[in-house]
């Protein structure tokens, strides 16, 4: 929704004047009305301020409400829930494909860093972040994960039934290029 609002405000700021007709004849009014004074602020500034107000109001929403609802679901049903696993299974091939495509550029980057001694700097920054605790998730994330794992309903499985045909279609479209790439790698071209 925020993206749609931002697009709308951007579109309004790109074309501030209405389109003019080519063969427009001017008519003289019977009564002359005074023209209102023009505002000093341009439309681009106004639309930017409007977008800022909308986004700031969206950013102040209460995130604790979702965690509280998950905790209530967890308290109501004490059996285990497999929704996370059911949703993860169809996504694993897509993630593996993305990682496969990222692997070679990542290896190239590491080799460039080794040549320029940049890996020492990268490890130093990573070690500093890990030592300061910036890489660990907050305890609230663990509580939300535990609450989600404790609740039990079959909505995840129903979602899986709906999503499965789309994921199968994506996998079908990925399969032939993947086989072509494997054959190219085997032939050594």
Swiss-Prot record:
Record topological domains on the Lumenal side: 75-83, 139-157
Role noted for this protein: Loosely associated component of the core of photosystem II (PSII), it is not always seen in crystals. PSII is a light-driven water plastoquinone oxidoreductase, using light energy to abstract electrons from H(2)O, generating a proton gradient subsequently used for ATP formation.
Stated name of the protein: Photosystem II reaction center proteins PsbY, chloroplastic
Prodomain residues: 118-143
UniProt-annotated location(s): Plastid, Chloroplast thylakoid membrane
InterPro entries named in the record: PsbY_plant, PSII_PsbY
Transit peptide: 1-74
Polar residues composition bias: residue spans: 10-24
Keywords: Chloroplast, Manganese, Membrane, Photosynthesis, Photosystem II, Plastid, Repeat, Thylakoid, Transit peptide, Transmembrane, Transmembrane helix
UniProt-recorded Gene Ontology molecular function terms: manganese ion binding
Family according to the record: Belongs to the PsbY family.
Annotated region described as Disordered, given as residue ranges: 1-24
Signal peptide feature range: none
Record topological domains on the Stromal side: 105-117, 179-189
